[in-house]
Amino acid sequence: MTFYLSGFRSFLKLWKSNPYFELGPATSSASFFLGVHCVIGNQQRWFSVKPTTPPNSKILNLLVTKARTLKKGNDSNKQASSGPHYFAAGEAKKRSHLSGNPQNQGHTLPVKSTVQLPTKPLNSEEWDKLKEDFKGKASFEDFVISQMTRSCSSVDVAKSLLAWVAAKNNGIVGYNLLVKYLYLCVFHKQTSEVIDVYEIMKAKYKSLESGGYTLLIRGLIHSDRWREALLLLEDIKKVMVPSKKNYGDCIQGALLHQDVNVAWSLYQELVGHNLIPLLETLKAFFDHGKDMNDDQYSNQLLDILLYLRNNQLYPGESFAHSIKTWFESIPGRQWKGQFTTIQKSGQCSSCGRAIESIHLSPEEYEFLKETIMRDVIDGGDQYKKTTPQELKRFERFVKSCPPFDIVIDGLNVAKMFPKGRESQNLLGIVSQLAQQNLQLLVLGRKHMLRPSSQWRKDEMEQVRKQAHCFFADNISEDDPFLLYATLNSGSHCKFITKDLLRDHKACLPDARAQRLFFKWQQGHQLAITKGFLKSKLTFQHILSYDTVVQTTGDTWHIPYDEDLVPRSSCEVPTKWLCLQRKTPAPC
């Protein structure tokens, strides 16, 4: 795609002008919203979570009442947790490294450029010489501008490239060159240059692709023409739902220019499309609200905190600081925040209050059980992992047994300790648990019953004497059986597997079911401590509290992600922000 500039204004005149070159705080290119070598296509989401209706005072009061019933009088117990739990942030990565299978082993080496990118603007002769030395098969201009975007080169250097291209092609510049130049202008916060490119595109095109819209929106929000970003958002709406980045940029532009009504209206549109807002968007609302004496705005910020709770979202460290700063700036309320941890007992190390229990209420348990049976076992993709006949056979087997205390993923557990024989590993675990008079269920595959170097017949016979056993076909997977047996045995039943059950959580239909599943999983999945074969069998401690935003009215407890501590989607933060109010809220 190309365009001619002669009908708009002289391209050479435009690019000879001295740029307004003010380097703002550099945004990491790795975290920037648009990949430098690609444009945004169809909107993609890992999962769709229907946002809860914005909470009102009644919902907040119910939450406060629930939290107050959990308060304990034992304020003297200040002993910290002696070790991380299985779902603590960063533990999955540690386990991966310990098992000799680290994630992301190595990194792809950067592609060697066949030309040395200039560090200062070049004239026509210098660009001619550089092109003569170019040995690549791709277009020289496309290759160089792509390398510039990857390196976040100076706007001046990129401008000299486009001026050279225009001079060689009678004022014609390819659309891709212009968009990548626009990327550099946005990255370096060159607002005047963004506006120049915007005027060119507006004159030549009735509509753009989504990547161009995204760049223009982010570039315009910092200028006095920020409302034109809202017009671009409307153009996107004509063909697709704007991305959460598009909405987030427009919200930040509205807040930057003091139009809070537009910002909140866009926020409601965003969640109304079942999009989860970027955390930086939510942070912008708290940053804007500092020292603001506006009850309506304050209530909307509290709604955001409850939105985090209902969707099990965790602010980053910077966002947590913004929340703390906002609370402490509320006039006349005297909120005080402290960054802290939660003890193994479930009490806050700062204020001593009890955090909500990890255990599901009877109503929550029945809801989750019915949902799992309907959407994961009966109506899910389990027949890709087993057969209807085998599932029926297992259901009859479970009904014939007493409720289990622990359900064991036999094959998974047997492979936890590579140095030991697999049947020996399994027998060691079963024997120690059987000594506690527990009702055990071992789930396995039929090949485990065939004698081999890894599966000794005498050891498997000992396993079958000490535990109920069910051996599925070799093509089957254990997870549906594990979930069925554990949930049917009651809330006391625990299970042992290294599998984090991400796929089954993803099968659940809504945010509530997914949150309850993860809460149940944290309270029921046992993780074996390494090296048990030479000592007594021990497990990592199970959390007694729920890692979720919560309030008692005069306190808030907000788990947050630490900087530089990686956390997978199946883990929870270990750091908390504790907020206490010294002055009661007005009636």
UniProtKB/Swiss-Prot annotation:
Pfam families found in the cross-reference section: PRORP
Bias (Polar residues) ranges: 98-114
E.C. designation(s): 3.1.26.5
InterPro entries cross-referenced by the UniProt entry: MRPP3_PIN_dom, PRORP_C, TPR-like_helical_dom_sf
PRORP domain boundaries: 342-578
Listed GO biological process terms: mitochondrial tRNA 5'-end processing; tRNA 5'-leader removal
Cellular component per GO, a single term: mitochondrion
A GO term for molecular function: ribonuclease P activity
PTM comment, free text: Degraded by LONP1 following mitochondrial unfolded protein response, probably leading to inhibit translation in mitochondrion.
Binding site for Mg(2+) 2: 479, 499
Subcellular location: Mitochondrion
Cofactor details (free text): Binds 2 Mg(2+) or Mg(2+) ions per subunit.
Transit peptide interval: 1-46
Domain free text: Displays a distorted and non-productive active site that probably switches to a fully productive state only upon association with TRMT10C/MRPP1, HSD17B10/MRPP2 and pre-tRNA substrate.
Subunit structure as annotated in this protein's UniProt entry: Catalytic component of mitochondrial ribonuclease P, a complex composed of TRMT10C/MRPP1, HSD17B10/MRPP2 and PRORP/MRPP3.
Name used for this protein in its record: Mitochondrial ribonuclease P catalytic subunit
The species this protein was found in: Rattus norvegicus
Gene that specifies this protein: Prorp
